[in-house]
Amino acid sequence: MSIYSMSKSALDMFTKCLALELGPKGIRVNVVNPSGVRTDFSQAMGVDKDSVNSLLEVTGSSYPLGRIGEPIDIANAVLFLASDECSFVTAINFVADGGALWGAPPPKLR
């Protein structure tokens, strides 16, 4: 876990440093930090599809938006950051995680 966490932190700081260096040339630099996203990665590593789907459903249900991310969710975040509508944004960590960073929603009261 420490190597993974340090790698993510390094990419975040690298983004900020590049944004400072390249901003004067009109180049924007941002990073997208997704949470769990439904892909074929685990199956390619040999994990059976039912186990993957079960884990994704449990994980997604703990997110405030109540679902796991889909590749299109991350693609849309990247598209937005690359668009003219986002032309004054640089050096940010765009968190596309369905609210996962903030934890599970509060339990429903009866």
Language-model features and meaning:
Residues Y4, D12:
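Catalytic tyrosine of NAD(P)H-dependent dehydrogenase/reductases that use a Tyr as the general acid/base
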Residues S7, T15:
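Active-site helix of classical SDR
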Residues L20-P24, S87:
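Alpha-helical segment proximal to the catalytic Tyr-Lys
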Residues K25, N30, I92:
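Rossmann-like NAD(H)/NADP(H) cofactor-binding core
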Residues P34-A44:
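Short, flexible catalytic-loop segment of classical short-chain dehydrogenase/reductase
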Residues V47-Y63:
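A short C-terminal helix-loop "cap" of Rossmann-like NAD(P)-dependent dehydrogenase/epimerase domains
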Residues Y63-I74:
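A conserved structural motif in NAD(P)-dependent oxidoreductases
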Residues V78-L79, T90-R110:
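Short C-terminal tail/terminal secondary-structure segment
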